[in-house]
Structures are given as structure tokens and as C-alpha cells.
């Protein structure tokens, strides 16, 4: 059978036996430190990349052309028609 429990799992509840918990205990602290380090590095790279890519607004010096009232009314009508 593919899902037969090992001798370190309770056959009824599939929970770890006390022997398995004792066997894993020396590695728990190191694994949590490694997990924290891995998550910290990943988060740091993500935040650094996000801040680097959103630092400059490339279009800040591009002037926005003025729009007259007729064009604005046409655009608003088109928007409202698409919305409904």
C-alpha cells in the first residue's frame, strides 16, 4: 500500500510518535533559524527590488496637455457608456 504509516507514526491518528518527536528535537532550533534566515533574505531581496524599481517616476517631466471642455464631455460620455 502506498500510504502505509511508518513505525514513527501512530497507525490510527497518523501523528508523530514520541520517538519521532525526540528524534527531530535537536534539529528544530537550527531549522527554525535557517527558515528565518531564508525568509529574511527573500524578503530583503523583494523589498530592495521593489524600492529600486519604484524609485524614479520616468514621466514626471512630461507635461500633461490641457483638454478642452468638449473633449472632456465626449470622453466622459464614452466612459459612462462603457460603464453601463
UniProtKB/Swiss-Prot annotation:
Q: InterPro entries annotated for this entry?
A: Coa3 (IPR041752), Coa3_cc (IPR018628)
**Compartment(s) where it occurs, according to its Swiss-Prot or TrEMBL record:** Mitochondrion inner membrane
Mode of membrane association: Single-pass membrane protein
The transmembrane residues are 31-50
Q: What is its main location?
A: mitochondrion
Q: Which GO terms describe its biological process?
A: mitochondrial cytochrome c oxidase assembly; negative regulation of mitochondrial translation
Keywords associated with the record? Membrane, Mitochondrion, Mitochondrion inner membrane, Transmembrane, Transmembrane helix
Q: Keyword Manganese, does the record have it? A: no
Highest taxon, organism lineage: Eukaryota
> Which residues lie toward the Mitochondrial matrix compartment?
1-30
Mitochondrial intermembrane compartment ranges equal 51-84
What are the GO cellular component annotations?
Answer: mitochondrial inner membrane
* Stated role: Required for assembly of cytochrome c oxidase (complex IV).
Q: Oligomeric state and partners?
A: Component of 250-400 kDa complexes called cytochrome oxidase assembly intermediates or COA complexes.
Q: Please give the family membership noted in the entry.
A: Belongs to the COA3 family.
Name of this chain's protein: Cytochrome c oxidase assembly factor 3, mitochondrial
